[in-house]
Curated annotation (Swiss-Prot):
InterPro entries: G6P_Isomerase, G6P_Isomerase_C, Phosphoglucose_isomerase_CS, SIS_dom_sf, SIS_PGI_1, SIS_PGI_2. GO terms for molecular function: carbohydrate derivative binding; glucose-6-phosphate isomerase activity; monosaccharide binding. Pathway: Carbohydrate biosynthesis; gluconeogenesis; Carbohydrate degradation; glycolysis; D-glyceraldehyde 3-phosphate and glycerone phosphate from D-glucose: step 2/4. The active site is at E355, H386, K514. Belongs to the GPI family. GO terms for cellular component: cytosol. The keyword Isomerase applies. One of its GO terms (biological process) is glycolytic process. Transmembrane segments: none annotated. This is Glucose-6-phosphate isomerase. It comes from Klebsiella pneumoniae subsp. pneumoniae (strain ATCC 700721 / MGH 78578). Catalyzes the reversible isomerization of glucose-6-phosphate to fructose-6-phosphate.
Length: 549
């Protein structure tokens, strides 16, 4: 990958000039000028997904100049580097190959002179055999009963992805009850353990190194709880499996290393649901549906790696995001799925985006002088409409939004889905076009009221509009379409990082807090006052000690 400061390119300078021409142009004006705007600024994927980006503050010239930026920063070369197994995560000297985990074509992907696909397929086959034994009931717990509950213990990428996907695919789930424990707060595991039976519970401990503080603290508490009933340490092997690469530590914990499922250093945590970390997904929806998830992602991988930038959906969404973040000064993006099963989707890509592109140092090791990753947030519709949409509609901040919805629901109750989708369509229309003062006054006249007598209210009912949105309409949320949607966002994130000259696949920002926590932990063991920190931290620690005494 090349190390090019995007602001030093001629394309960036052209975009800055173009922004000066575009900053006061409204979405309403763009639609008024072009009756064919929707067809020009939308695209479908595999007849399963429609991406409408017409309600953005862009023209064909905007996209052309953004494409020039992608060319000048060698996005095509960056894509080729990732898919070919080059070590593009330079700060950790690692390849980035989550795409290999879903490489259903089985074409060789080489890292350090070795094709990784045989090992990928071997772990998949091992997960298939294990999951079929658990799901069928042929795997028995220490008292001879089949497993009824699965508890995934992990944090970050070892939790967010599997939890999001198992929730999104609940219509496909089997009889097993899935639980997820991530927080080192003892409340999290305590509440889960209240609802499971040690005789019929399987714990998945997801930690590559088997040393992650939060995960191993929870895993040891789970084992203690289990042994309080089971008694004999040998029973641990029937009720615990590991998603890890540290065979020694796994064995010492009491887990049979035959039930250790490996992954590789070229799998980043926040891109790991496709790996052994996805075992909880397989146990929830079955191996065949997991393969469909992989296949959907692989289809998007092929689209991303082979489609020209002008028609490449992840690239288009990434470029539009850069346009708002760097030229309009938009600091956030909202992800708003109109599907209750997708309620963890925004949280998943909050990590996916912010941990990937939340960097202020470029690939040359210099502080950037432009914007990198945005703040990502969101909640399912229509709940969000009754919470934070007020600010999106009438606040002082620009919040570009992605609206996501399925055309077909898994729960066709009465007219629920039509009402849900009527809101989905209405919100993007309202955000784009707003409501003028003239329309507000006419509405009063239609009600037989004189607008002049209501002048004190009229300004508050005006909507400026011109709020940008993308709409992603899926035919239906299936394992395949969900896989494609996740990969769409993954590649959008990669594209932005490549163009913005940052390392997307490391996360050094999570380290300092962990280091300091490890230093503070011994200081919390006794009641003596602490004076080794700044006055604020000392004061907080000492008050904590006083109150817990």
């Amino acid at each position: 990958m090349k190390n090019i400061n995007p602001t030093q390119t001629s394309a960036w300078q052209a975009l800055q000039k173009h922004f000066d021409e575009m900053k006061d142009v409204t979405i309403s004006e763009l639609f008024a000028k072009d009756s064919d705007r929707f067809s020009k600024f939308s695209a479908t994927f595999d007849d399963l997904m429609l991406v409408d980006f017409s309600k953005n503050r862009i023209t064909e010239e905007t996209l052309a100049k953004l494409q020039d930026l992608a060319k000048e920063t060698d996005l095509a070369g960056a894509i080729k580097s990732m898919f070919s197994g080059e070590k593009i995560n330079r700060t950790e000297d690692r390849a980035v190959l989550h795409v290999a985990l879903r490489n259903r074509s089985n074409t060789p992907i080489v890292v350090d002179g070795k094709d990784v696909m045989p090992e990928v397929n071997a772990v998949l086959e091992k997960m298939k055999t294990f999951s079929e034994a658990i799901i069928s009931g042929s795997w028995k717990g220490y008292t001879g009963k089949p497993i009824t509950d699965v508890v995934n213990i992990g944090i970050g990428g070892s939790d967010l992805g599997p939890f999001m996907v198992t929730e999104a695919l609940r219509p496909y789930k089997n009889h097993l009850n899935m639980h997820f424990v991530s927080n080192v707060d003892g409340t999290h595991i305590a509440e889960v353990l209240k609802n499971v039976n040690p005789e019929t519970t399987l714990f998945l401990v997801a930690s590559k190194t088997f040393t992650t503080q939060e995960t191993m603290t929870n895993a040891h508490s789970a084992r203690d709880w289990f042994l309080a009933t089971a008694g004999d340490d040998k029973h641990v092997a029937k009720h615990f499996a590991a998603l890890s690469t540290n065979a020694k530590a796994v064995g010492e914990f009491g887990i049979d290393t035959a039930n250790m499922f490996e992954f590789w250093d070229w799998v980043g945590g926040r891109y790991s649901l496709w790996s052994a970390i996805g075992l909880s997904i397989i146990l929830s929806v079955g191996f065949d549906n997991f393969v469909e998830l992989l296949s959907g992602a692989h289809a998007m991988d092929k689209h991303f790696s082979t489609t020209p930038a002008e028609k490449n959906l992840p690239v288009l969404l990434a470029l539009i995001g850069i346009w708002y973040n760097n030229f309009f000064g938009a600091e956030t993006e909202a992800i708003l799925p109109y599907d209750q099963y997708m309620h963890r989707f925004a949280a998943y890509f909050q990590q996916g985006n912010m941990e990937s592109n939340g960097k202020y140092v470029d690939r040359n090791g210099h502080a950037v002088d432009y914007q990198t990753g945005p703040i990502i947030w969101g909640e399912p519709g229509t709940n969000g409409q009754h919470a934070f949409y007020q600010l999106i509609h009438q606040g002082t901040k620009m919040v570009p939004c992605d609206f996501i919805a399925p055309a077909i629901t898994h729960n066709p109750l009465s007219d629920h889905h039509q009402k849900l989708l009527s809101n989905f369509f209405a919100q993007t229309e309202a955000l784009a076009f707003g409501k003028s003062r003239e329309v507000v006054e006419q509405e009063y006249r239609d009600q037989g009221k004189d607008p002049a007598t209501l002048e004190h209210v009229v300004p508050f009912k005006v909507f400026e509009g011109n709020r940008p949105t993308n709409s992603i309409l899926l035919r239906e949320i299936t394992p395949f379409s969900l896989g494609a949607l996740i990969a769409l966002y993954e590649h959008k994130i990669f594209t932005q990082g490549a163009i913005l000259n940052i390392f997307t696949f490391d996360q050094w920002g999570v380290e300092l807090g962990k280091q300091l926590a490890n230093r503070i932990l011994p200081e919390l063991k006794d009641g003596s006052e602490v004076s080794s920190h700044d006055s604020s931290t000392n004061g907080l620690i000492n008050r904590y000690k006083a109150w817990r005494a």
